[in-house]
Structures are given as C-alpha cells and as structure tokens.
Amino acid sequence: MKFFVIALIVLLGLLQYRLWSGSNSLPEYFVLQKHIAVQQEGNDKLNERNQVLKEEIIDLKSGTEAIEERARNELGMVKEGETFYRVVGGERSVSSPSQ
C-alpha cells in the first residue's frame, strides 16, 4: 500500500511538472493565445481591406464614373471643353480696424 501511495505522489508530481513547466504547459498555452489574438486582429484588418478592394473592383467594372473620378483625382485629367482651375491657398492677413 505504501508503494502505491508513493507511486501516486510521484505521478502527481510529474503531471504537475508537465502542467507548469514542460512542453505544452499552461504558460506556453497563454503565450500562444496572445499570439493567436494578435494574428486574428491582423487577419481582421486584412479582411476589411480586401472587402474595400473588392467593392472598388466591382465599382470600376460596373461603370465609368469611378474610372473618371480616379482619372481626375490621380492623373489630373479634364474633359474636353472643360477649363481647369487650380486654387492655391495662401495665408490670409487679418487687418484690424485702425482707431
């Protein structure tokens, strides 16, 4: 009977060692959970970006308005017969009334 109790205590000690400091231990589990959370957050951001790009592709395929808008904004193109005006902002000086 003593041998059986000693064997159980040794077995319990080995299991506790594996639980706290061996491979696949609890601290390692928590570190992996943090890595998974960070990776999931990155995946969510990439999924949002992919969705925006998919919508932009659909918009570009469906009509000419999106293409025209990109050409105007990114390439500075104008339609035939249009006049392009560039307004350059400068600093305004506020003059106070003289007394």
Curated annotation (Swiss-Prot):
* Residue ranges annotated as Periplasmic topological domain: 22-99
Question: Chief localization class?
Answer: membrane
Q: Which domain of life is it from?
A: Bacteria
Any one Gene Ontology cellular component term annotated for this protein: cell septum
Q: Which UniProt keywords apply?
A: Cell cycle, Cell division, Cell inner membrane, Cell membrane, Coiled coil, Membrane, Transmembrane, Transmembrane helix
Coiled-coil annotated spans: 36-73
Annotated membrane topology is: Single-pass type II membrane protein
Subunit info here reads: Part of a complex composed of FtsB, FtsL and FtsQ.
Question: Which HAMAP family did the record assign?
Answer: FtsB (MF_00599)
Give the UniProt family note. Belongs to the FtsB family.
Q: What name has this protein been given in UniProt?
A: Cell division protein FtsB
Provenance organism? Shewanella sp. (strain W3-18-1)
The lineage is: Bacteria, Pseudomonadati, Pseudomonadota, Gammaproteobacteria, Alteromonadales
Originating gene: ftsB
